[in-house]
């Protein structure tokens, strides 16, 4: 009798072990959802390649000193750590995960090495070798909004399109059949400049497939903050301007022809064109314009501490200046040193 009871309890125990193991495995596979209003990176950073992304106390960045492998660090450039050894861009981050577009095969070194396949990827921040390809496509831009990734694609079969996919990799769908730069998300709405017919500001509500004309002005690189739209005015010599969507008022922030820009809490960093190009910054109301550096620069990415940029046509060195403090241009030596230190191990 006692042996029979022991046998029964043993069977029950084994069953419970299997059940608990299955539950744990399912929980580990479950993709943690983001709260409504989540946006994976700033529009300005994504327009400039999405090479830097700040989230939850860390800055995730593509390190050009290491073939654009994915690294992370504290905003003050301490605690540098290599996460993924492939060439990455259009970085987004929120909650448990970091999302990115994989461009190439990279060096194949480091935690979380990914096979040489371009596409949209999701990786765990604290366990970067746990990585998933959400869609193997040719793309240029992706943005995380709530629990979906919006991204553009190009293929011989489908042409160009704007697509959406859940962060789990499910429910992929085509939203628009023309090229869109998905970068600017504000108030549960994706904003973009229409690439065909005109450059009007368009908007598509998250979860919708219908795009609406918001502003009948030909613009480029719209960054929406509340009711304000910072952008480049195509028919005003590509000047840097701000539109008030409520009143319709336009404010010229900088008359110089502008190639690209990015917006911080206090300043707008912008690159001028012409015979004497300069990287400059101006207060968001259009006052206090000042030169950051002479010459042509691009890849203007901003964090809470620094503005990062590189010379046009060059990958390194990466320059930086305090994003909201006094201008003091130096080089991003910590990124280079991290690669050198890793090579000695």
Where are these regions (language model features)?
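N-terminal, intrinsically disordered, polar/charged segments of Gram-positive cell-envelope systems
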Residues: 26-82, 345
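A short beta-strand motif characteristic of beta-propeller blades
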Residues: 32-44, 78-84, 128-134, 170-176, ...
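Repeated scaffold domains used in trafficking and secretory/extracellular systems
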Residues: 45-54, 85-95, 136-146, 177-187, ...
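Residue position within the beta-strands of beta-propeller blades
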Residues: 60-62, 99-102, 150-152, 191-193, ...
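Hydrophilic extracytoplasmic domains
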Residues: 272, 283-345
